[in-house]
Swiss-Prot record:
Oxidoreductase is among the record's keywords: yes
Residues noted as binding [4Fe-4S] cluster 3 in the record, renumbered to the chain: C409, C412, C415, C459
Residues annotated to bind [Ni-4Fe-4S] cluster: H250, C278, C317, C517, C546, C581
Native organism: Methanothermobacter thermautotrophicus (strain ATCC 29096 / DSM 1053 / JCM 10044 / NBRC 100330 / Delta H) (Methanobacterium thermoautotrophicum)
Top EC class, one word: oxidoreductase
Cofactor: [4Fe-4S] cluster; [Ni-4Fe-4S] cluster
Enzyme Commission identifier(s): 1.2.7.4
Phylogenetic lineage: Archaea, Methanobacteriati, Methanobacteriota, Methanomada group, Methanobacteria
Record protein name field: Acetyl-CoA decarbonylase/synthase complex subunit alpha
Domain 4Fe-4S ferredoxin-type: 399-429, 440-469
Length: 780
């Protein structure tokens, strides 16, 4: 088989026994010795969409859900024209405040997307180097639609690891165009910047799917296993008598090779391997013997505890002062990716034993090793030799020392002023000076303090407040023993067939996905309580990353974690841990599969029809209660483009932009019924696309509300409104005053609340309206 390429050679004369020709041009391309299966036909109108190809869909979303901007400041300081004040003015380049905010949002989304894309590129290239380009993508007999995002965006199914390189090439090309639009004197419209942010979010979705797909098939991670094992979670599960290797970050390769080295040398029981953040999630997907310390909020506390003999860092969400903190108690640091070199010498080509000796003897502060297999050997050998030397360092300041340190406090109050959650830090320190550690202990046990360390930076007496908080909570650390279900990967096709109709018709009231980071306003318990609320109400609860860990750190009144109480099936009352940050792609993927499997919508190149279906029919809502990073911004924006609303915590307003609907503007909610061709009155469902709630109570009510969809059957709508009203009464004390907007006919009214609701309807002069048969925002 000859694959024609553009390079060519010309022959002036070509003669033979039966051939005589001149000026023949022959193109010779790659010679392929093995026949490849024919590529699937591209079915949809827009495969591999360029920056503007989905702009019309974006504008429909932005017309309904107008951007609400909350800038940190009114200045633009991006070029040497500035700095320019934009409050009621334009900058020297002509940009206004809204457009500048939209550009900032696009930049944040691109940073997040680049982080996931860089991660995916690392994985794909390394795994191809190990296994070859022809390594098959196979998720088992229960998953036929193994890459729903890739199929929809690229227009074809990836069959091998090599095919994923093509996906990465496309995403990286799009990111280059998007970033160029941020240059001074380029895009000048805020909504077009938002359209580009949507495209960046879609590229983020795409590259996350590539990353998780590659590691699932190449490392044999669970392939949609609803019975994925329960693994250990919490400080108290770590055996501090053993050498301890701690992995921090998101790239599974170094951690997997550490586990492999232990296994190959029959040392599994001699060394503890644990992780913080998504590295922990993915290492336990690879080997259930590894342990999860907790979400990224545990990072500084655990490093300060001195438990880790070796700290292996890869990429994303690692404290940039990790080396400085590790050196305080002689923990060895190994950096493993080009994203985070920490100023360390590159030891990739050095003999492993030499690296170990240099680390043990303090000849180097740490090592940069870009070969994951070598990381495995060096990390284990270093931990084995360093642990006996460091045994006396695995402790925090004693109680008397804490009292002495606290007595240095000058009552300046700066620790409280700079605390992101305005915790009573100074009061806790003052009580500690009197020998009362209860307030410090409360901050540790209730996870109110997520150890950002800003209080220490401001303290004029250099009081190590985070270390004091950690020590105060130490006596309870031994009780921090929980169970979390290992990340299972995508929803199986058979599960989608089972739940597709109940979700679209409203019989299952919704799919709620708790994702994101641990920048919580009042601790991780809030996430667990919200998850518990919706599990008890028959929702499907999906989770990933730090959110999955926070849910696991809660025990109910029976002493069980929610993972022990609820199964891992993608079905009503299922608590589904899909995996790490990159596994968030399976949340969007499940919604896409519903459109394909239940509604028979073709995927390939058919983004707009799929997104339109999800927006109007699939009752799903994302919750990023502790979102802090640019990655979280990209994830939320990508999910929004598919038509899935997201609720943020109060810190989410710092992303500078929300997508809020106006329920009072009836024109914005009109729908086209594709079955009849008529434009009909709609309802604010979902009312918002990106919303920041002030507290758990408000968020819980809003989540239930954002699962309402125009296609709910009367029975399904009754169920959804029953939850909405019940939660509103439970947390806010009243029946919602907008309930009339969601009653289409009297059949929608929950029987339990019929009298109260009918009274409201009469007061508001409510009129019944027609139910849409096939609602859409599209013209066709």
């Amino acid at each position: 088989m000859i694959d024609v390429a553009p390079e060519s050679k010309k022959a002036k004369d070509l003669k033979g026994d039966f051939w005589d020709a001149k000026n023949i041009q022959i193109s010779i391309g790659e010679i392929i010795t093995e026949e490849k299966p024919p590529e699937e036909e591209v079915k949809g109108p827009k495969p591999r969409p360029h920056v503007t190809d989905l702009r019309s869909w974006d504008m429909k979303l932005l017309e309904r859900y107008e951007p609400f901007y909350a800038p940190f400041c009114d200045m633009c300081c991006l070029c040497t024209y500035g700095k320019c004040e934009l409050l009621g003015k334009k900058g020297a380049c002509g940009i206004d405040a809204a457009t500048q905010q939209a550009r900032t949002v696009l930049l944040a989304c691109l940073i997040g997307t680049a982080a996931h894309a860089g991660h995916a590129r690392h994985l794909v290239d390394h795994l191809i180097e190990r296994l070859g380009e022809d390594y098959k993508i196979d998720l088992g007999s229960n998953v036929d639609i193994e890459a729903p995002i890739t199929r929809t965006v690229m227009g074809k199914r990836p069959a091998t690891l090599g095919d994923l390189r093509e996906v990465m090439d496309y995403a990286e090309e799009q990111m280059s165009h998007l970033l160029s639009a941020c240059h001074t004197g380029q895009e000048g419209d805020s909504k077009d910047f938002e359209s580009k942010a949507f495209h960046a979010g879609l590229m983020d979705d795409l590259t996350r799917e590539v990353a998780d797909l590659a590691q699932i098939v190449a490392l044999d991670l669970p392939k949609g296993d609803e019975d994925a094992p329960l693994v250990e979670l919490g400080f108290g599960t770590i055996d501090t008598e053993k050498p301890v290797v701690l992995c921090i970050g998101h790239n599974v390769l170094p951690g997997a090779d550490i586990v492999d080295y232990l296994d190959e040398n029959e040392m599994e029981d001699q060394v503890e391997v644990c992780g913080i953040c998504c590295a922990a999630i993915d290492v336990t997907r690879y080997n259930e013997a590894a342990k999860v310390v907790g979400p990224l909020s545990k990072q500084l506390r655990f490093i300060r505890s001195g438990v880790a003999d070796v700290i292996v860092v890869d990429e994303q969400c690692v404290r940039t002062d990790v080396l400085e903190e590790a050196l305080k108690n002689r923990s060895a640091v190994i950096a493993t990716t080009d994203k985070m070199c920490l100023g360390l010498p590159d030891m990739t080509d050095e003999d492993p034993d030499k690296i170990v000796n240099d680390l043990i003897n303090g000849n180097i502060e740490g090592a940069l090793i870009l070969d994951p297999e070598k990381v495995g050997e060096v990390a284990v050998k270093t931990a084995m030799k360093l642990a006996p030397i460091r045994k006396s360092l695995k402790k925090l300041p004693d109680i008397d020392e804490i009292i002495e340190l606290a007595s240095e406090c000058t009552d300046c109050g700066w620790c409280q002023r700079v605390c992101p959650n305005s915790l009573p830090v100074m009061d806790a320190v003052k009580k500690a000076a009197d020998g009362d550690l209860s307030k410090l202990e409360e901050m540790a046990i209730e996870e109110l303090c997520y150890t950002c360390g800003r209080c220490e930076q401001e303290c004029e007496r250099n009081i190590p407040i985070v270390s004091m908080v950690t020590k105060a909570g130490e006596r309870r650390v031994k009780d921090e023993k929980y169970r979390i279900r290992a990340g299972r990967g995508p929803a199986q096709d058979v599960e989608i067939r089972r739940v597709g109709a109940p979700i679209v018709l409203g019989d299952i009231p919704g799919v709620v996905a708790f994702v994101g980071c641990s920048n919580y306003p009042e601790g991780g318990k809030d996430v667990a309580l919200m998850a518990k609320e919706f599990l008890e109400r028959n929702y499907i609860v999906v989770t990933t990353g730090c959110g999955a860990m926070s849910i696991g750190e809660y025990r109910d009144e029976d002493g069980q974690t929610l993972y022990e109480k609820y199964g891992g099936q993608f079905d009503a009352k299922g608590l589904v841990n899909m995996g790490s940050c990159v596994s968030n792609a399976h949340v969007s993927g499940a919604a896409i599969k519903i459109a394909n499997i239940f509604a028979q919508k073709p995927l390939e190149g058919n983004f707009e029809e799929i997104a339109d279906y999800i927006l109007n029919r699939v009752g799903a809502c994302g919750v990023a209660w502790g979102a802090y990073s640019q990655k979280a911004a990209a994830i939320a924006t990508g999910v929004n483009r598919w038509g899935i609303p997201v609720v943020l915590g109060p810190h989410g307003s710092k992303y500078r932009r929300l997508f809020l609907g106006r329920a009072d503007d009836e024109e914005k909610w009109k729908l086209k019924d594709l079955r009849t061709g008529e434009v009909i009155d709609g309802e604010p469902a979902p009312e918002h696309l990106l919303y920041a709630a002030e507290n758990r109570e408000e968020a819980t009510v809003m989540i239930a509300k954002l699962c309402i969809r125009p296609t709910d059957t009367p029975k399904g709508r009754q169920m959804k409104l029953s939850n909405y009203i019940d939660l509103h009464r439970k947390y806010l004390g009243t029946i919602p005053d907008d309930i009339d907007r969601f009653i289409r006919t009297e059949k929608d009214i929950p029987i339990v609340y019929k009298r109260d609701v009918m009274k409201i309807l009469e007061e508001k002069n409510w009129k019944p309206r027609e139910l849409p048969k096939e609602p859409s925002l599209l013209e066709r």
